[in-house]
Amino acid sequence: FTSNLDEFFMIRVGSLCDMAAVDKEHTDSKSGLTAKEQLHLIYKAVEPLYARRDAAFSDVDSKLSAIGLRRLTMDSLAPDEQKYIKRYFKDIIAPVLSPQIVDSHHPFPHLEGKVLHIAALLSHKKTERLGLLPVPASLPPVVFLPETPSRYILTEDILLAYADHVFEMYDVLEKTVLCVTRNADIQVDDETFGVEGGDFRKKMEKLLRQRRRMAVVRVEISRPISDHFKEYFRSRFEVSDAQIFLSRTA
């Protein structure tokens, strides 16, 4: 479900977003709807699917936990496990982190599609800032506990818990795991590559670079956040509330 939905947003929703921007009055011959109307119905239909997916995952997770394979949170770790994770964070995770502060001197960085980030609303001397912490691709997504390997915790959950430590100079007002999906509907034709051939590899690399920087079509967050916090994402990514989805399951 998740990978199919990703592809649907990247290609179909991406294509509709392009059409909505170029020709707002054009109607689809099959549905009789404009691109904007189709997008509205898609967003409305997709939101409850997230809840169904999360409920299905929770059911499977409970059944796995019953037979000993248990996904943990920082709050559910035993004292010795908390000590292990604290050392693991200090020795393995912290050295490869690249936290970023968004303010008047540091513009909002480009976020690649389908890359997890910890986003934190920060406060210092009555001034709010946004903190971003990419989840490093070099780290394993899952950390298994040494004494009982059937007990594990997600790396993103560790980072979310330690966001207060990473941004220790600030008060962390809110935080969430953040993931954006970008439009990937790039039209490739003979003109793009040239009928004469040429360096296909360089042209494909250019297309892939273009794909990574295309418009955001979906924003996923791991927990409910305030409308004030959402505004950072709405304004930066130029998305509506309908494009911000609560996704409790990674």
Label each PLM-derived region with a short phrase.
Residues 1-250:
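N-terminal non-catalytic structural scaffold regions of very large proteins
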